[in-house]
Amino acid sequence: MNKILFYISMERERHIEDLKKIASLSKNKKNVKTQKQRNLLGKNVITAIKGIGCRPEKVFYKPTTNFSVNGSLSNKKGLRKIGKGQMGEVFLGCVDKECKKPVAIKVSNDSNKYEYKIGKRIEKLSGTRMYAYQECDKYSIIYTEYANSGTLSSFIKNNISTLRPIHLRTIVTHVLFNLYRIHKKYPSFRHHDLHTENVLISTNVKSTGIRRFKIDDIVLKVHDIGIEASLNDFGFSSINGIPNPEIDSGDYKRKHGIYRESHYMYDVHYFLNSLRHFLKGEKILSGQETIQFIERVLPHDYLGMVTYKVSDFRLRTTPVGHEKLQTFNRIFKDRYFSPYREKTQELSKVLDIIGRAAPMKPKPIIVKHGGNPAPPKVSVSKKGYVKIGTRKCDSYKKDELVKIANILNVPTKNKTISKICQDLKLKYIK
């Protein structure tokens, strides 16, 4: 017992020290995006591709360098290939010349509308933002949010010299909590392919001090260090109400355990098991706490590439089930998350450096007392026709125009649309 308390204390102290070292960096990061800006980008994309969604190379600007996306200036239209998977190729394009609004573009030979629909359904629970879908003659395209730090694998490799246990703890906490939230709302959801290449990392997000994660009776106060992990690539995913031909065929059930009734902890197991394999294989020294955590919460029979419970790192289909697997509640009670349970005076000082989230400002309460709506504006265009608001008067349907005329106290009995418009002109245009 004393040994466990020692480890808890040691890991918590290391977490606070790491937090001190990165606190100022988190607060002073440049080019960060707020949630409002990220949502607005989706509207920009939809506007940009309107009518020409099958030709993204004609719409977006091509980043000029492989070393920096944000801030690169380009006058050349086109895309840059950034990845390739089993379901298609992924390209990068920019809405603007400065590439402050990058977009990921996935092109597949087959229709993947089911993938877009599944991703769209869970995006608010921290799936990748799905902007638009376009069905073309011989291929289909999904426009999604671009994660500036790439996949979890590339993020770890590219930051190996500065990576600390706090970074991995933050990412693991985000992924597990997001899966928990998704399962609470959509119990039938399975990602089925959640390895380190299908978790995307964004480091250009705004830090908000502390984020409160509630898992049943557990409350974690997670320190926001400006890193966000999201789920990506829903080609093998399933959720009630959306057919997926890739898994509904049954081709992946026996070998990979992929089918609609797979174990509800399938994604948690595959993510943790594949992450452990990656950290050990790449010899990531800062990953030791995470490796030890995974080996505590996953039974020995569920670790590695092949056991009688696991095939290719995935849960096997078995008639006896997987009763040894822990629930979300039990996993989040592990000491790995202890830095998020207690608030010390020292930790409070560090959070002051990061900056606490501003309290939510309540929206003004508008009390409706009835009465007539504000009268619309009547004007005459340069071409001489009558306008009501922003529309031509004669473009309104008869019943719509009668309601407007009644508000403006213009008689309408036995009058045509043309006559009502003329009367409005006579009354309001001097």
What role is predicted for each listed range?
Residues H15-L79:
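Juxta-kinase regulatory segment immediately upstream of eukaryotic protein kinase catalytic domains
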Residues R80, M87-R121:
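ATP-binding glycine-rich loop module of kinase domains
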Residues T128-R164:
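Conserved structural core of kinase catalytic domains
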Residues K184-T196, I201-S202:
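Catalytic-loop of the protein kinase fold
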